[in-house]
Amino acid sequence: MKKKVLSVLLSVAMISTLLVGCGSGGSADSADAPADGGNSDDAVTTASSDGAEEITWMFWDDLNATEDLISIGYKDVVDRFNKDYEGKYHVTPITTNLEEYYTKLNALVASDETPDVFIVSPGPNLDVYVDPGVAADLTDDLKADGWMDTFNGGEGAFSQQTYDGKIYAVPLNIAAACVFYNTEMFEKAGISTMPTDWDGFIDACDKLQSAGYTPLSISAGTAWCLSMLAGYLCDAEGVDLDAIDAGTAHWTDSNVVTAANKMLELSKYFQPTAAGDTNDVATANFYNEEAAMLIQGSWAIAQINGSNPEFEDKCGVFAFPGTNGRVIAKSDSLAMSAKTEHKEAALAFMKYFTDDTAQKYTAEVGGKIPVTKVDYDADKAPAQLAYVMDVFSNASSTFGFYNESLASTEAGSTFDDAMVSIYLGTPVEEGLQTIEDFYVNNVWNK
């Protein structure tokens, strides 16, 4: 059965909201990497020696070693581009891990070696490249040949990538933060109805624990994973980030305290090694059936199915409980260096990520929601994608990662660190005071 993605299930208004809360110009079917900025994935494609125009692209995964299906799809984009433009253009990836990505990208920017194209998350993580003029204005390029018209929602698809009316990045896919669960463990624990509120969630955890299972796998070693959970809890308690930015609400308010205490209440159901486990380890705990649930973005579908294909049949998905239908949504995006000397090559490469081949792969293999109007075969897509689409179709609204939605990247990092610190034993009020102090010194008095 063929489905036109999002145009049936999601309205244009919803797709615009998703990206705020978070045909092609290339083939529809079809540079010198700095020494200290990351690894050059020369094995992805043979480096050009035929005089082709060289560009670089920086990404947060090892394209040669990865089992992540979305990353494997990006590797295919690189290979297709280099093959199709052989003798004219050639792209060399610069790769690192996610935890070190922005540190290494910023080092390249500071040394005036910004990659021609680089992946970025919208929000403050993109602001820091827009404000100093590192990222190029892509507005005219998107409108010039109908590229923008291929996106669901047209210009609305670029809401979170737009600053002062100009577009600085191109979204590649959409994902939602959900609760993944082991259907067999839930059945054996006597859970037949998925929890929709906090009390139901705690009750499910109790039943799983009583049945001998670790209820939740999560990473506090990778701070944003714990922070994502905290963001859901804060939003459920009515924390208003606009009011906090304006100084009319505070990080020490009772609703934030309640959210932090709920995080601690839930933490008794985490795996014993959560404090040191990385995101990859926590995810592996789930797909290796060492825990019953994983609170993670739907980008994890590619990692779960790529690492353990047999687990797909027993992997269910439900919306995080108690949020009144609100869902965390996120999109990976591509930016182009404002100083690139290879603009046409860079744009041609970027268009390959949103052509029909790449976007079909996004849904049919990677399990993420495409951003274009591409038709995809729902029967080929991972089973979990349909569950995520159900979460989106029932969403009342969406919002972004807290660490990407605060006043600055530094504010986001402060929030992340405070949540980890509270989990590790810092008293709630003391931990929240560190965020409050940051805002006093860096946001409200500026």
Regions of interest found by a model, annotated:
Residues 205-208, 246-275:
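Glycine-centered hinge/linker elements that transmit conformational signals in sensory
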Residues 58-60, 67, 76-77, 228, ...:
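Extracytoplasmic/periplasmic substrate-binding proteins
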Residues 38, 97, 121-178, 202, ...:
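Hinge/lid segment of periplasmic solute-binding proteins
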Residues 53, 83-87, 189, 261, ...:
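Extracytoplasmic/periplasmic substrate-recognition and gating elements
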Residues 7, 23-127, 131-132, 144-147, ...:
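Conserved N-terminal structural module of periplasmic/extracytoplasmic solute-binding proteins
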Residues 163-172, 177, 202-248, 291:
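Extracytoplasmic/periplasmic solute-binding protein
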Residues 153, 315-318, 363-414, 421:
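Long, aromatic- and glycine/proline-rich binding clefts that accommodate carbohydrate-like moieties
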Residues 187, 395-446:
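Conserved C-terminal helix/tail region of periplasmic/extracytoplasmic solute-binding proteins
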